[in-house]
Amino acid sequence: MAIYTSGTQSDNSEPVGNDPKFYTRPSLGLKLWGPLVPSSDNTTGLWSLVAIQTGLGLFLMQRFRKLGKKWVKRDIADFPSLNRFSTTHGDMYMTRHIPVQFGGTHSFNIRVGTRTGFWYSERFRTIRRVTYLLAGTLILSQSMLEVSRLTLLKYDPWVEEAKSVREKQFFNDIVKYYHEGVDSTKFKAKDELSGQSISLNLPEVKQSIAVARAQAQAENLVTKWFGPLDYKPQSFSEFLDKLEYYLNMTDFLNNLRRQKKNDKINSQLVKLEEENKRNRQRIHTLMAHAPARAIRTNQEVQDIYAIRKVLLHHDTESPNDIPLTEIWAIYNPWTNLALDTALSIKFFPSVIFNEDYYEHQKRLKDSEHVTSIENSEDERKP
């Protein structure tokens, strides 16, 4: 365990002449903030500045809207000079500089304080409105540009560079602090269990102190916001070149992946066609060498009803595994017989009415008469 104690600065110490140069962090829509732009991998800082900038743009647009002509909506009944002998109600619009207090003819004696000069003229107000409009539009467009960069880009070269530089700086600080050694006037090491002092020249102690110092440097507020202060970000042209290279490589890999899939599908289709060709040849050979009457003709096949088959599950190993109740409910033979049987039923009436009945009685009488005549002729014969 290392304990840091502040040391005294020597009066003879000279300022360092080679101070690292600070470079403005890159961005697409935060140029307004200049050197305050955070590192590209600091998403919290970027979104904070975008929110503040958007609020500023909305404020300017609100100022542009408020500097326009103000119209006041009043009821006609509030104007005695216009509505003296009537109770008619209606709306009347007027500018705000007209006095809104009306109490009779004495209201026309109210003087309105007016200011003169260029700063209070209509021309200067127009200039202010145009300025607010242009500034608000520019700021909002810049905010939208930065939001598009933060949300739409899947690969951001500035972000990848900032992450890489931050990680390199952390490990470089560890190596630097390790080789610098430990000043006994600033650090003391004690054993965590026994509490006794430990020599600062041990490699384990030097390594632990170097990691602690590098971690403290990385967690510094300035380092968190800007990243390593001495690194120079890549220019906008390099940013576009790397982004274009990434997009080209992405398209190339996607096309290569699709080409592999298409080649695989084409090879499978070729194999399927060859297999179908072999199957057709085998079927043709079997048909050619089959004995007579071994293969039924189409007419014979049509006369044979298809037998309903029961398909069991592939896990069925014994008769006990067969669900007889379910199979009987699905493949009921009586239901199958009803589906396969076609019946034609005709109903004949057993009772005849009206004309048909009388005609039937007449036919019966005629037949009885003919029968009696035939019997009498038979009796007369010897």
UniProtKB/Swiss-Prot annotation:
What GO cellular-component annotations does this UniProt entry give?
A: mitochondrial inner membrane
Q: Which InterPro entries match?
A: i-AAA_Mgr1 (IPR013911)
Which cellular compartments is it found in? Mitochondrion inner membrane
Which membrane topology term applies here?
Multi-pass membrane protein
Question: Coiled coil located at which positions?
Answer: none
Q: Residues on the Mitochondrial intermembrane side?
A: 1-44, 147-382
| Predominant location category | mitochondrion
Question: Could you list the residue ranges that cross the membrane?
Answer: 45-61, 130-146
Kindly indicate whether the keyword Membrane belongs to this entry.
Answer: yes
Q: Which residues lie on this side of the membrane: Mitochondrial matrix?
A: 62-129
Keywords in alphabetical order: Membrane, Mitochondrion, Mitochondrion inner membrane, Transmembrane, Transmembrane helix
Q: What's the stated role of this polypeptide?
A: Component of the mitochondrial inner membrane i-AAA protease complex required for mitochondrial inner membrane protein turnover.
Which family is annotated? Belongs to the MGR1 family.
Q: How does it assemble?
A: Component of the mitochondrial inner membrane i-AAA protease complex.
Q: What is this protein called?
A: Mitochondrial inner membrane i-AAA protease complex subunit MGR1
Say which species the protein is native to: Kluyveromyces lactis (strain ATCC 8585 / CBS 2359 / DSM 70799 / NBRC 1267 / NRRL Y-1140 / WM37)
